[in-house]
Amino acid sequence: MTTVGLIGSGRIGGTVARLAVAAGHQVLLTNSRGPDTLKDLAAEIGPLARATTGREAAEGGDLVVVTIPLRAFPSVPARPLAGKVVIDTCNYHPQRDGQIPELDSGALTSSELIQRHLPESAVVKAFNNIYYRHLASLARPSGAADRSYLPIAGDDAAAKVAV
């Protein structure tokens, strides 16, 4: 059974957690306010979900989803994510995140910024172009004829296969 660590358990993270548990995976939920604030969500999702800290989710996740406002990416613990596949859902919103010169100039993409912060991880961009409610309502089991597909992007072929 795969364990999915979620660094961020808001709309996208909570939806990904529900879908992962429905597919039989364990999930580790985190947010910036601490595990106590996620106990109700973990209970709602079921026994395969557990509220924890960001570091514990990074250490315990076989696959880790970073789904936080982009301005918070420096808080993502790099060392425990070394050698792991990290799914980046972050989008840059200057009005929320503040100005990030490398992104404003086009010198870097948001995923390149995160990859620079996580140099020993394989970062794959996914889930950043779909409304969280559609992510849930369009979910189908593997092999379903009406299954939706989401684009992903990354430099590591094996990591993209894992996602």
Map each language-model feature to its residues.
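NAD(P)+-binding Rossmann beta1-loop-alpha1 motif at the extreme N-terminus of oxidoreductases
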Residues: 1-44
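Internal alpha-helical scaffold of NAD(P)-dependent oxidoreductase catalytic cores
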Residues: 41-44, 52, 116-123, 131, ...
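Nucleotide donor/acceptor-binding cores
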Residues: 2, 84, 148
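Rossmann-fold NAD(P)-binding glycine/threonine-rich loop
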Residues: 90-141
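Short, well-ordered alpha-helical microsegments
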Residues: 38, 73-74, 160
